Amino acid sequence: MHRPMRQRARQVTDRALICAMLDGMETMFIGIHDEPAPYVVPVNFGYAFDDDLVFYFHCAQEGTKLELLAKNPNVSVTAASFISYVGGSVKGHMHDYRSVMACGVAQRIDPEAEEFDRAHRLLLAHNHRVFMPEDVPVMRHIQLWRITCRAEDVTAKAEIVPKTVQEVPFAPAVPDGTGLDESHILRERG
């Protein structure tokens, strides 16, 4: 369900940059179909971006999220980060953001499947936690889910578009009026 981005100058299409952006994001929001309005829930996540972008999340054995996913597994996801440069700027900008959005299909992972352990490890790694073999029995009491998003259904955007993976972390602000060369911004704005 890809829609063209209006502000294409801010679009990030390089897969390595998208992964680096996701690496800096801690929370993902899942939009699930409900009436009269979508049900949006924040979750921590892990991911793998091979042919498709696959997000992994965990949850309890019951709840609203699971009831709604049983009715309609088609979801949207958003992960984002934002910084405000108080008293300064970067390349003439007073703030910066990174966002990744996608549509996909959610599916529960069988606890006996090989993918369950992989998903568990990716989830832990993304959240800066260490895999402990003694946690495996505990993991059998929660659910792990995957959201599979086709690569063409993934969009990413930034206020100051990074050109390299090293530029993905937010740059430190410089005091206003320090004479930065901002001519590239004026050219982009046309």
Where is each model-derived feature located?
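Catalytic micro-motifs at enzyme active sites that drive phosphoryl/nucleotidyl and oxygen chemistry
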Residues: 32, 87-91, 132-135
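Short hydrophobic-aromatic micro-motifs
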Residues: 55-58, 77, 100-102, 146-147, ...
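Short, structured beta-strand-loop surface elements
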Residues: 62-119
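Extreme N-terminal tail/first-helix region
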Residues: 1-23, 170-179
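A generic structural signal for nonpolar/aromatic side chains embedded in well-ordered alpha-helices
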Residues: 22, 68-69, 123
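Short beta-strand segments
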Residues: 25-61, 77, 88
